[in-house]
């Protein structure tokens, strides 16, 4: 992220999506006013109509309205980035936005880094997977992603949850064998 410039680019957008796990349309709808730098949070309360004529729309569901905690480095970077931008205007939207444009930029970055190509939505999945592997509860991950229920999270990340459960079984068995 040290290569990022001090002007708004899709790279900043990709960084924010990967650090927060928010949806593409939620990230597009962000305005400087949505950032609470002193509390290190980001308010998600709307989406951007990128498939239609542009403009703000409601979130996917009631649970999608949420505050996402951010790390201090991201807070510092975005405080500087949005400092002189209009409070109520979307940070990343200039004219018509195509999902394919942003996915193309991400694809180029993936290829340059020599890693498998993923989409912007793939960044959301990666974010959630990293949290689950770090031991964050399913309930917390569901809240952070704005899922309507934990069931959504459990279904979507079943493969990871199963992998973690088999790790847990190993830990349990080791603990039990040490009880002699």
Language model segments and positions:
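C-terminal secondary-structure termini that scaffold catalytic or DNA-interacting sites
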Residues: 39, 52-76, 80, 84, ...
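Structural motif
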Residues: 34, 39-41
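Short, cationic motifs built from Arg/Lys/His that form the positively charged side of catalytic pockets
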Residues: 9, 22-25, 66-68, 82, ...
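Basic, Lys/Arg- and aromatic-enriched nucleic-acid-binding interface segment
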Residues: 2-30
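Active-site/catalytic core of tyrosine-dependent DNA strand-transfer enzymes
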Residues: 47, 71-116
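C-terminal catalytic core of tyrosine-transesterase DNA break-rejoin enzymes
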Residues: 15, 19-26, 105-110, 124-148, ...
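Phosphate-coordinating loops and pocket residues in cytosolic domains that bind phosphorylated ligands
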Residues: 29, 37, 155
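Short basic/aromatic active-site micro-motif
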Residues: 9-11, 95-100, 116-135
């Amino acid at each position: 992220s040290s290569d990022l410039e001090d002007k708004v680019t899709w790279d900043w957008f990709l960084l924010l999506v990967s650090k927060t796990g928010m949806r593409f349309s939620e990230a597009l709808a962000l305005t400087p006013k949505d950032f609470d730098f002193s509390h290190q949070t980001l308010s998600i309360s709307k989406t951007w109509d990128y498939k239609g004529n542009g403009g703000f729309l409601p979130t996917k569901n009631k649970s999608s309205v949420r505050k996402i905690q951010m790390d201090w480095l991201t807070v510092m970077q975005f405080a500087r980035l949005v400092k002189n931008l209009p409070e109520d205007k979307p940070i990343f939207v200039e004219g018509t936005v195509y999902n394919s444009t942003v996915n193309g930029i991400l694809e180029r970055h993936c290829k340059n880094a020599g890693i498998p190509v993923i989409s912007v939505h793939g960044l959301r999945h990666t974010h959630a997977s990293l949290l689950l592997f770090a031991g964050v509860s399913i309930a917390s991950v569901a809240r952070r992603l704005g899922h309507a229920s934990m069931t959504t999270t459990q279904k979507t990340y079943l493969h990871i949850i199963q992998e973690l459960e088999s790790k847990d079984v190993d830990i349990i068995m080791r603990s039990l064998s040490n009880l002699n």
